[in-house]
Curated annotation (Swiss-Prot):
Protein name, per record: StAR-related lipid transfer protein 3
Residue span of motif FFAT: 55-61
Annotated catalysed reactions: cholesterol(in) = cholesterol(out)
Signal peptide: none
Post-translational modification, as annotated: Phosphorylated. Phosphorylation allows the tethering of two membranes that participates in the formation of ER-endosome contacts. Phosphorylation of FFAT motif drives membrane tethering between the endoplasmic reticulum and late endosomes that in turn allows the efficient transport of sterol mediated by the START domain.
Domain START: 79-292
Purpose: Sterol-binding protein that mediates cholesterol transport from the endoplasmic reticulum to endosomes. The sterol transport mechanism is triggered by phosphorylation of FFAT motif that leads to membrane tethering between the endoplasmic reticulum and late endosomes. Acts as a lipid transfer protein that redirects sterol to the endosome at the expense of the cell membrane and favors membrane formation inside endosomes.
Organism, scientific name: Salvelinus fontinalis (Brook trout)
Subunit comment: Homodimer.
MF (Gene Ontology): cholesterol binding; cholesterol transfer activity; protein homodimerization activity
Amino acid sequence: DGYICNNGMDKEERKMCGLLLLPLRSVSPSAYLAAVNAASERAPMIYPRAVSEGQFYSPPESLAGSEEDLDEEGLGRRAVSPQEKALVRQGKEAMAVVEQILAQEENWKFEKNNDVGDSVYTLEIPFHGKTFILKAFMQCPAELVYQEVILQPEKMAQWNKTVSGCQILQRVDDNTLVSYDIASGAAGGVVSARDFVNVRRVERKRDCYVSAGMATDHDGKPPHSRYVRGENGPGGFVVLKSSSNPSVCTFIWVLNTDLKGRLPRYLIHQSLAATMFEFMAHLRQRIRDLRSTR
């Protein structure tokens, strides 16, 4: 277990992934992300559930797959500048790490659950530390959760009290955007509100929807004295379709965050798990509200 990728693969599989000669003690964070990204491209079979061939997500006003630059009608948005290409690369790196986390579910450590059956797990990630993973079963189609949580992040503050605001700073291409997010205070006010700037990559696959992201810098939102600027490691939202029942789905939230400030680690961990459960309560209420108005 001194290697980056050792989740049940034999020697040849690890060699194929390009990870055999990368012990954790000798690689940098950038090398780790590059290796994970390369593994996801060269060996998709190690992600049996998270990765499948399918159509990519595209925003309502654009068409995925176009090679043209953004025109007056908003079709075919793609990264052009070096900064935009760097953002796309960051998004792909975050997506690769999230897919690795999903592929290692047998290594998730159970932490706690609530009275409706939602469970929080943790997993130690190289260079990013403890990652929290919430897994919940939902009595609604995957498309509904995708619409509310992944497709419309800027509207989440309307129903999710754990978030004070979300603003789309830039749509980089049909799969990548940069968002500015404000997280509400937690732990009874002991943890004050934090703000984040994240790059997000969204993909729509045959059996799931995925939004993966991580912290980035953007000229549109430099750090402000009003908030402590937090920093997210690779994480995101996953909505898994049911192969047998289209009216239910599984929701997974992967959270790796550094809230900064001088907070005791135990308090941070307690507040993160509580926030994840609270988010699920708000999400279920949102789904009920939507169904009652249809």
